[in-house]
Design a protein with these regions (language model features):
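Conserved beta-strand-loop-alpha-helix hinge in the C-terminal portion
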Residues: 194, 219-220, 227-256
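Hydrophobic anchor residue at the start of the ABC signature
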Residues: 163-164
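ABC ATPase nucleotide-binding domain signature region
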Residues: 44-122, 319-373
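The feature captures the beta-strand-to-loop junction immediately N-terminal to the Walker
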Residues: 36-38, 308-310
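Conserved structural motif at the start of ABC-family nucleotide-binding domains
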Residues: 5, 18-22, 277, 290-294
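Conserved ABC ATPase signature
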Residues: 150-154, 158
Length: 373
């Protein structure tokens, strides 16, 4: 069986990029692999070794990308991440409000079709065969209705398609995706899994998914490699991995810890407003596209709300108004804890009353330090 990627006793030359043990890994023709493990366990560092980012001491990785005629590893292995789709990977200039500060849409604002054409041109020569591939990708991804859309107005699910299509124009032999399902609703996750399944079946493409949760492993995955405590476990079939996987505990916290949380001292709130959030006839618009139109919404003290809807429906936009991340919120009739927006308060005066967690927040607060060996 053809070994596409083979690593034997891999140890990086630089100590700060080393795993706890030498890495042994093989990826063979017909295998689609999930790399699974907890955050901070070493998955990203393992992928860096797979793609040859860090030179090894003894044995360099062996690659056999045939039938591909391309020789460079970077041409045959494409690694895309989905930690955040606004701003490039490891972009230190990214900030939390970046998505909402892109207010000016003019003739210089890129549209999907132009950016995809740019990616197509950079990936190779313009030939009838490659144009046929481009057309096939557009049809497979159902992207026709997205081509004339501004890139900054794409939803999370649409951005995944955009980024994936851009990568496939280069016809890689191996496609590695880091957390492809993060931040997607259930329906969009299922659609993406079906799309990846089709790619795995119809193309000479090996797919490797980097996942934090074993529940995200799609049906088309054939093998699993677990990475934890900076160690790469032996590869096993998906069935073997699922059979030996530890059951999910019925309780995430012990009764003792739960009681300690219940017994935490009550903190009297500074504000006693009956209306925590109040919006009146709120309208959010980018260019000709209306995201929210004449929205009335009141959240009363003690209520618990769930915002549900498809990707692109406006959920994140609505939260950006509450948290004052969207500059358009200052032109809207919005009150938080009884204080109308735009009454002289700073963004931090607003945020100090709100607890907020999101992929974009982690992205903007990321550190860029290697693990110590």
């Amino acid at each position: 069986m053809q070994k596409i990627i083979s690593i034997k006793d891999g140890v990086t030359r630089m100590p700060e990029w080393r795993m706890a043990e030498p890495v042994n890994f093989e990826s063979c023709e017909g295998e689609h692999i999930a790399i699974v493990g907890p955050n901070g366990g070493g998955k990203s560092m393992f992928v860096d070794i797979i793609v040859g980012r860090h030179p090894l001491l003894m044995h360099d990785p062996d690659y056999d990308f045939s039938p591909s005629t391309k020789t460079l590893v970077s041409d045959n292995i494409k690694y895309i991440t989905f930690r955040d789709t606004y701003g490039g990977d490891n972009d230190r200039t990214y900030f939390l409000q970046q998505r909402w500060n892109q207010l000016e849409i003019d003739e210089n604002t890129p549209i999907v079709k132009d950016k995809l054409e740019e990616a197509y041109s950079m990936a190779g020569e313009d030939t009838p065969e490659r144009r046929a591939l481009q057309k096939h990708i557009y049809e497979l991804f159902h992207m026709e209705h997205l081509l004339d859309k501004y890139t900054i107005l794409l939803s999370s699910g649409e951005l995944r398609k955009f980024k994936l299509a851009s990568t496939l124009f280069s016809e890689p032999r191996v496609l590695i995706m880091d957390n492809p399902f993060i931040g997607l609703d259930a329906d969009t996750r299922d659609q993406l899994k079906e799309l990846l399944k089709t790619l795995a079946q119809e193309h000479a493409l090996q797919i490797i998914l980097v996942l934090s949760k074993s529940d995200d492993i799609p049906d088309f995955i054939t093998h699993v490699v677990e990475v934890k405590d900076m160690k790469v476990m032996p590869k096993m079939t998906k069935e073997e991995y699922l059979a030996q996987r530890a059951p999910i505990p019925s309780r995430m916290l012990s009764q003792e810890l739960e009681q300690q949380i219940i017994n935490l001292p009550y903190s009297d709130r500074e504000y006693k407003s009956q209306e925590v959030v109040k919006m009146n006839k709120v309208r959010i618009q980018y260019g000709k596209r209306i995201i929210l139109k004449d929205l009335d919404w009141t959240v009363n003290n003690g209520e618990r709300w769930a915002l549900s809807g498809q990707n692109g429906a406006g959920k994140s936009t609505l939260l950006s108004l509450v948290c004052a991340d969207n500059p358009q919120s200052y032109a809207c009739d919005i009150a938080l804890l009884g204080n109308p927006r735009g009454s002289g308060e700073s963004i931090w005066d607003i945020k100090k009353h709100i607890g907020y967690v999101s992929p974009e927040l982690h992205r903007s607060s990321a550190t860029f330090q290697p693990f110590a060996s």
